[in-house]
Regions:
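Short beta-strand elements in bilobed, periplasmic/extracellular small-molecule ligand-binding domains
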Residues: 55, 60-81, 140, 186-204
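Beta-alpha junction/loop-to-helix N-cap segments that form part of ligand/metal-binding clefts
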Residues: 70-132, 226-249
Length: 329
């Protein structure tokens, strides 16, 4: 009898331990506490601003005491992105914020259950390989796009640099969203009778030599929204022994090597992404029906780099009169 009682006690104890373990595996959101994993591809001004905006909006919506951020940086290593997002999935965080396309594609392969919000992703259809993309990813994925109107950026080349007849299109070949942007800008410029040439670098190791070649062979350059270019923007400018004007895809790149851009505000982009996170976590929003959010036209800003414009004898007063504002250095 004592043996039977001892066995029963052990069974009950084991059952209790399993129950406690099961309880500990429940998401922290059950008591209003949330853990959010942030995977940022690389450190540069635009992505940093998006992450800050995201965190500020989440804290505003959930309360600082109710959210813990597990913030990781992949140092521009796509393999590290996958390691980070796999770890988030193992930890069963309540939501993943993926900052930049490689972070998003990694997160999508790590989990089909945890909500994933992308930000600083230019074109979700291209990044995720979705044919006939209709604006909603579905499943456990949504987010915000940093795509600015490419035809308007291309038109800036014609407006600011009317004497430019040859334009080099410079970007990182490892970034599919850069290919998408360059193809659109090339199509626009070709239609206007401008001669275009494409120049690609594979990573930061060859960006300088490719940038110099592009500058030597063209009257002006276009650099799209591109994470490697953003990380190396100053190196791009310094590599040009003969300085040529660059129209940039966003203000961070323009700050390092460009004369002008039509840019979104990455902090505001992050804020919008954070508001989406609050809607999902606090209000029970259905991420599968959430369309990708884009910056409206009225929030885009025409910007110029005063120091580079002056160095290249670009008429700053004309830019001001056309509604351009100076980038803060």
């Amino acid at each position: 009898m004592k043996t039977a009682k001892r066995i029963l006690a052990l069974v009950l104890m084991a059952t209790m331990l399993v129950s406690f373990a099961a309880c500990s595996e429940q998401p922290a959101a059950d008591d209003g506490k949330y853990t959010i994993g942030i995977c940022q591809l690389v450190t540069h001004e635009a992505l940093d601003a998006a992450t800050k905006g995201f965190k500020d909006a989440v804290v505003e919506g959930l309360g600082e005491e109710n959210v813990t951020f597990d913030e990781q940086n992949a140092s521009n290593d796509t393999t590290m992105c996958k390691t980070i997002t796999d770890n988030f999935a193992t930890k069963k965080v309540d939501l993943i914020m993926a900052n930049a396309t490689p972070a998003l594609t990694a997160a999508v392969t790590s989990t089909k259950d945890i909500p994933i919000l992308g930000t600083s992703v230019t074109e979700y259809g291209v990044g995720l390989g979705i044919e006939d993309f209709n604006g909603t990813v579905g499943g456990n994925v949504s987010g915000t796009s940093d795509l600015a109107p490419l035809d308007q950026q291309a038109q800036m080349i014609l407006d600011i640099l009317p004497e430019a007849k040859k334009v080099g299109l410079l970007y990182c070949s490892a970034e599919p969203n850069s290919v998408y942007q360059v193809n659109k800008v090339k199509e626009f410029l070709d239609g206007k009778g401008i001669t275009t040439a494409v120049y690609t670098f594979s990573d930061s190791s060859d960006v300088a030599i490719v940038a110099q070649k592009a500058a030597d062979e063209n009257d002006a350059l276009y650099v799209p929204t591109d994470n490697t270019a953003a990380e190396c923007s100053t190196a791009i400018y310094n590599a040009m022994t003969t300085k040529k004007p660059i129209i940039a895809g966003e203000q961070g790149i323009c700050k390092g090597c460009g004369i002008a851009t039509l840019s979104i505000d990455y902090y505001d982009l992050g804020v919008k992404t954070g508001e989406m996170a609050v809607e999902i976590l606090k209000n029970g929003g259905d991420i599968s029906t959430m369309a990708i959010e884009y910056t409206p036209q009225e929030k885009l800003t025409k910007m110029y780099n005063e120091s580079i414009c002056k160095e290249l004898n670009i008429d700053v007063e004309a830019l001001k009169n056309a509604g351009y504002v100076a980038i803060e250095q």
